[in-house]
Amino acid sequence: MKELSSAQIRQMWLDFWKSKGHCVEPSANLVPVNDPTLLWINSGVATLKKYFDGSVIPENPRITNAQKSIRTNDIENVGKTARHHTMFEMLGNFSIGDYFRDEAIEWGFELLTSPDWFDFPKDKLYMTYYPDDKDSYNRWIACGVEPSHLVPIEDNFWEIGAGPSGPDTEIFFDRGEDFDPENIGLRLLAEDIENDRYIEIWNIVLSQFNADPAVPRSEYKELPNKNIDTGAGLERLAAVMQGAKTNFETDLFMPIIREVEKLSGKTYDPDGDNMSFKVIADHIRALSFAIGDGALPGNEGRGYVLRRLLRRAVMHGRRLGINETFLYKLVPTVGQIMESYYPEVLEKRDFIEKIVKREEETFARTIDAGSGHLDSLLAQLKAEGKDTLEGKDIFKLYDTYGFPVELTEELAEDAGYKIDHEGFKSAMKEQQDRARAAVVKGGSMGMQNETLAGIVEESRFEYDTYSLESSLSVIIADNERTEAVSEGQALLVFAQTPFYAEMGGQVADTGRIKNDKGDTVAEVVDVQKAPNGQPLHTVNVLASLSVGTNYTLEINKERRLAVEKNHTATHLLHAALHNVIGEHATQAGSLNEEEFLRFDFTHFEAVSNEELRHIEQEVNEQIWNALTITTTETDVETAKEMGAMALFGEKYGKVVRVVQIGNYSVELCGGTHLNNSSEIGLFKIVKEEGIGSGTRRIIAVTGRQAFEAYRNQEDALKDIAATVKAPQLKDAAAKVQALSDSLRDLQKENAELKEKAAAAAAGDVFKDVQEAKGVRFIASQVDVADAGALRTFADNWKQKDYSDVLVLVAAIGEKVNVLVASKTKDVHAGNMIKELAPIVAGRGGGKPDMAMAGGSDASKIAELLAAVAEIV
C-alpha cells in the first residue's frame, strides 16, 4: 500500500476516474443553492441531485469529484471519536445512466489494489452487500475477493423518500487484531458493532429503482436510467494510507494541532486526553471553509451552527489554557493544508480571520455573562438547600452560553455541587430530535421523469430577437408525447425560440404563438429548461397545434425590456457593493422580475444608510455614464482572465457568456441585457434587510418604478411638512426634531410626576403590614398605568424596612400584573409567584429577590391577595 499525502490521494482519485472517461466536477460551495432540504452540502452527491432525478442531463454521464461537506448532527461527539468530523471531504465517482454495477465494482477494486494506483493489500479488504444483491456478490468474487471477505448486511439498501434508490456495497479496510482487543473479528461487521479494526473507506450505491413509499420495496419499479453514486472519505483513506491511529493524526489535521500546541504550551498525546486539540482542529476547518463560502455566525440556521462550533472550540482552548482570542490565528494553517485544491481559504484569509476574531471577542463577553448566570444558579441552590444543578439549567449554559458540560461540572464541583447528567442528556435529546425532524436527510432526489428526459430534439434560444418563425418539434400533454393538441395546457419544444427560459435569477419570458394566418393559437405562460437543456414552453392552448408545423413565436417585448433593466442594474449593484462594503459581498441569490429586482449577498452586518446612499449614487452614476454593454462567448479560463466574476453556486459549461458593462462590471451571465446602461433610466433602493445569518437582501426598482418610488417619497415628505407646518420641505426635518425634543421633555416630566404620585401612594400601601409564619408582608392591589410603576413601588419599598415581602397586584387593561419582592432568604420571590400567578390564570417567574407575572382573570385578584398568607 502506497503511503500518500492527502493531496496525493485526492489527485490520484481524480486522475484514475479521468482515465475511465469521467469529467471532474469542481467542489461546490458549502452553502446549498436552490435546495431548501439542505442546511449544508453534506455529501458528494448532494450537488448532483439534478442529474440523478433526471431534471438535467449532464454533458458527460460519468462524473468524479472531491466535495467539501459539512454534517453537524452530532457536534458533541467530535473530538471523542477517531473519525467523527463536522467538515470532511467526500471523494466520489458517479454514473448517470451509463455504466453500472460491473464497471463500478471492477474499477473500484482496480483503484484500490492496482500497484499503479493505491496498491491496497487485497487480503486487508472486506466488502458488505445487500443479501438479495447476488450480482454484487458474484462481481466481487469475479474480481478475486475471497467469499470469507464478503459479508451480507440487511441494511445495505439506500433510499431517502421517493426517487432513486438501490442496494449498496461497502468496502472496509482491516487494521488487524491490534485494533480488536476482544478478538471479535467479523462479527464487528456483521452485527454493525462500533470498532476501530474494520474502517469503512468507500460506499458504492447501485441506484436502480424508483423508490415509492406507497408500495413495498419488492414492487419498486426499475429506473429508466440506472445510476452509480459512490462516496469515499478522504480523511479515512488518509488515516489508513498514512498508518495513523485516528484521522486526526494525518496531514489534514496535525499541522493545526501543532499550532495549537504552540499557542497553549501543551503537548498533544495520541494516547491521552486529547479531545480539546481534536475539537479545535476540526472546528476551525469547518469555520474557515464555511465562512469563506459565505456563511457567517449568527443566531439561526447555519449561522447558529457556526456560532456553536466557534464557541465550543474557544471553550476547549480555555481548557488548554488559551484565554485570549486564538482561533483566527489558525486560519492560515488550514489554508496552507488545503491550498492545492482549495485556494479560496488563503485567498479570503483576511476576511475569514476578521469574522472569526470578531466572533471570538463577542463570545468572550458572553462567557462572562454565562459565568454570571452560573453563579446565580449556584446561589439559588444554596438558598434552597439543594445540592444538584438541574439538567435544564446545564443545557441552557451549554446551548445559550456555549459552556461545555465538563466546564459546568468542574465549576459546580468546585462550589460543592453535583450536576444532573441524565436531565442534561434528556434536554439535549429533545433538541436533537427537533433538529432532525426539521431536516430531510440529504433531501429526496425526486422521481425521474422519463418523458422529459427523453426529449433529445435540438432547440436553440435566440438572444437578439423578440419574434421568429420556427418549427414545432415536441408536444407533451398529460405527461405523454403527442403529435397534436387543441386544448388545455401543454409543453412545447421548438427548433429555435426567442423565449428566455428561467435561469440565473431572470424570470422566463411570456408571450404568444401564432399560426400562418396570424391567429394566436397558444399563450406562453412559463419557460423552463428541459433535462437536456431545451427551452420547454408551458402554454395555454387556444387552437390546434401540431408537430412539424411552423409557427410565429412572439415574446412580450415590453415585459422583457423591464426585466432587462432590472437584470443589468443587478450587475451594476453587485459591482457597487464590492466597491462600497467589500469584496466579500458576493451574490447569494437574485431575482430579476418585471417590477423589481431582488439581490441577496453575504455580509456580516446591516448596510448603513450612508453606505446605501453611496451604493445608490454609484449605480446611478454608471447609468448616467451611458456605458456600452457587450456580450462575448468564450471558455471559462479566458473569461476569468477578462476579470469576469463567476456567480455564487453557478455551474458553467465549456462555453460561457461574459457580460461587460463598460469597464465597470464584468460577469459570467447567461441572461439577457440592455445595449447601454442609460436605458435603465434610474435606480432606487427601496429596502435592505437581513434574511438569515450573514446574508443581506436589497430590493430595488428601476426606470418608471424608480421614478414612482422617488415621487412617493416626495409626497410623503410634503405631507409631513404640512403636518408640522414647515414653510419649505428642507425645513421639515428641523421641525420634526423640535417636536420630538418637546415630546421627550414632556415624557420625562410625566415620568417624574408618576414617580412622585407613586411615592405618595406607596406611603399608604406600605402602612398595611401583615404577618404570617414569622414573615412580615404587604399584599395590596394598586392602581397604576403600567408594569413599570409596580417596579417603582418595589424600588421605594427597598429603601426602608417596611416588611420582609411585598406582593402587589394591578389590573391594567384586560391583564393582571403581579409583582413579588423579597428581602429574606426564607422567601424565594420567583417560587412564590409561580404559586400565586395561576390564581389569576397567569404564569411568571424571576429571581429570589424579585419576580413578576402576568394573568388574565381580574376577578380573582382578591383571592390571590388572600392566598399570600398561606404561601409566604
Swiss-Prot record:
Binding site for Zn(2+): H567, H571, C669, H673
SUPFAM superfamilies reported in the protein's UniProt record: Class II aaRS and biotin synthetases, Putative anticodon-binding domain of alanyl-tRNA synthetase (AlaRS), ThrRS/AlaRS common domain, Translation proteins
A cellular-component GO term for this protein: cytosol
Cofactor details (free text): Binds 1 zinc ion per subunit.
Entry keyword annotation includes Protein biosynthesis: yes
Reaction(s) catalysed (UniProt annotation): tRNA(Ala) + L-alanine + ATP = L-alanyl-tRNA(Ala) + AMP + diphosphate
GO biological process: alanyl-tRNA aminoacylation
Keywords, sorted A to Z: Aminoacyl-tRNA synthetase, ATP-binding, Cytoplasm, Ligase, Metal-binding, Nucleotide-binding, Protein biosynthesis, RNA-binding, tRNA-binding, Zinc
Top-level taxon of origin: Bacteria
EC number: 6.1.1.7
Subcellular location, record wording: Cytoplasm
Pfam hit, one: DHHA1
InterPro entries assigned to the protein according to its UniProt record, in alphabetical order: aa-tRNA-synth_II/BPL/LPL, Ala-tRNA-lgiase_IIc, Ala-tRNA-ligase_IIc_anticod-bd, Ala-tRNA-synth_IIc_core, Ala-tRNA-synth_IIc_N, Ala-tRNA_ligase, Ala_tRNA_ligase_euk/bac, DHHA1_dom
Cofactor dependence: Zn(2+)
Any GO molecular function: transferase activity
Keyword ATP-binding: yes
Record remark on domains: Consists of three domains; the N-terminal catalytic domain, the editing domain and the C-terminal C-Ala domain. The editing domain removes incorrectly charged amino acids, while the C-Ala domain, along with tRNA(Ala), serves as a bridge to cooperatively bring together the editing and aminoacylation centers thus stimulating deacylation of misacylated tRNAs.
Protein function: Catalyzes the attachment of alanine to tRNA(Ala) in a two-step reaction: alanine is first activated by ATP to form Ala-AMP and then transferred to the acceptor end of tRNA(Ala). Also edits incorrectly charged Ser-tRNA(Ala) and Gly-tRNA(Ala) via its editing domain.
Similarity-based family: Belongs to the class-II aminoacyl-tRNA synthetase family.
Protein name: Alanine--tRNA ligase
